[in-house]
Structure formats: structure tokens, C-alpha cells
Amino acid sequence: MKENEKVIMEKGIHTDFKENMTYGEYLQLDSLLSSQKRLSDHHDEMLFIVIHQASELWMKLILHELNAAIESIKQDKLQPAFKMLARVSKIQSQIIQSWDILATLTPSEYIEFRDSLGQASGFQSYQYRMIEYALGYKTPHALKIYEKDPELHARLHTALHAPSLYNVAIQALVKEGFPIHKDVLNRDITQPYEEDATVEAAWLEVYADVKKYWNLYQLAEKLIDIEDWLQQWRFRHMKTVERIIGHKMGTGGSSGVSYLKRVLDQRFFPELWNVRTKL
């Protein structure tokens, strides 16, 4: 072996793990890396599985950060929440890039194993549903999808009835003294949020006097960041689906691309977008 080809091993590097935990054990890699089970013999099904599993792991972290941010804002601890929400945006940017990898799957390749999926579909992702709930887009009718698993159904039911990120953001406006209409404060939070003139007026005042309401302004911009990234994710999802299956019906029974295009019109924080026109 030539001198420049020698493997450099520092003396302090640990090599005896008979009584110590290894990297693989800490991350439970045996379990994690044995979860990619193809239902067909097609080579590209592994890509399909890994992309979706990796996205679910990132969504788990998004939920971890969102729920912590919601609790932090409830307790008037906005600065820690800003860090958590900024991290959510970074994770979102990472997930968006995964569509570029999935887009390497051609229609001819996908059709070889698509039937193996049966009725399984990303539409059924319970973590994505919980992210929507955490952001304020509540869809009670969607709970029926998860009745097969009572424990999971109960978790989603709890998430449906929990205050969303936008709920606690509006409460932060109230604590600052903004007059928010009682219908907003007493609304059924299990239903999709509908924009309100008093909420818009409050955010407009925040944006008109940034120095006075700096923390609320920062909070608003963090929310905009998250919705912006989410819409980019939705768009890349729609275009990747169109690229691979065209306008076929989705495996979950949806209209596919047509449904995904309609979803692009859904907004989580409507007043924060409206104030940009009003300023």
C-alpha cells in the first residue's frame, strides 16, 4: 500500500463496543433499515419507498417543532418559538428537494409496480394531516380514513381538537390589546379557519408599526415562511404527480392532479397575505 493510501486511524478512536452502545444501536438502524419492503420485484420501488419514508421522518420532526412552538407561544415565550418555526421552514426546504429525486421515476417505471400499492396513498399520511391540523386547516371528515387503527384515530381526534399555531398567534394579538371579534375567539376550532376583518386589522397595525410590535411582526413572518414553503411543497407534489402519472386517478381515490391543483388554493393564514395588499 502506498503511503498516501494508508487509512488514518487516530489512537483515541473507540473500537471496542462489547459493553458500549454503538451508533447503529443508538439510531436503531437494524429496525429502520429493514423497513423498506418491496411488494414487487421492480428495482425502482425501493426509490418510491425510501422517498416517502424519509419524508415521514422529516414530518415527524416538523410536528415535534410545531407542537413545541404552539406551547411556547401559549406561555408568551415567543423567542424560543421563533427558533422552532425557523427550523420547520428549513425542514420544509429539505423535503421539497425530495421531489427532484422522485421525479427521476418515469411513467414507464412507475406503472410496473403501481398496482402493488393497492389503495395506499400519500393522502392517507396521518402525519401530514396532523401538520395541517397544527397549522389550522381542520378537516373533521378526514378522520374516517383512520378508523382502521383506533389508537391512531384517537391521536388525530386529539389533534383536531387542539389549538392550532394560528389560534395561539391570534391569542398573542389579544394579549397585546388588539380587539379581536368574539366570534373568532369562541369559534369551533375543529372547523377550518375563516378569515376575519378584526384579525386582519390587527395584523395590519402590526405591520404598520414594526418597531412597536416587533415580536408579533416576527411571529407573522415566521408563519408566512411556513405557508410559503408548504405551498411550494404542494406545487412540486402536483407537478411530480403530473410528470409521472399524468391526469390518472390517484391510488387513494382522488382525482389526482386536479385535486392537487385545488389544494393550492387553500390558505392557512389568510389575513397575513391580505395585509400585503392593504399596506
Curated annotation (Swiss-Prot):
Binds 1 heme group per subunit. Its cofactor is heme. It comes from the Bacteria. It holds the Pfam family Trp_dioxygenase. Keywords: Dioxygenase, Heme, Iron, Metal-binding, Oxidoreductase, Tryptophan catabolism. GO terms for molecular function: heme binding; metal ion binding; tryptophan 2,3-dioxygenase activity. Pathway: Amino-acid degradation; L-tryptophan degradation via kynurenine pathway; L-kynurenine from L-tryptophan: step 1/2. Its EC number is 1.13.11.11. Substrate binds at residues 48-52, 110, 114, 251. It catalyses: L-tryptophan + O2 = N-formyl-L-kynurenine. Disulfide bonds: none annotated. One of its GO terms (biological process) is L-tryptophan catabolic process to kynurenine. Heme binds at residue 237. The keyword Protease does not apply. Belongs to the tryptophan 2,3-dioxygenase family. Heme-dependent dioxygenase that catalyzes the oxidative cleavage of the L-tryptophan (L-Trp) pyrrole ring and converts L-tryptophan to N-formyl-L-kynurenine. Catalyzes the oxidative cleavage of the indole moiety. Homotetramer. NCBIfam families: trp_2_3_diox. This is Tryptophan 2,3-dioxygenase. The lineage of its organism: Bacteria, Bacillati, Bacillota, Bacilli, Bacillales.
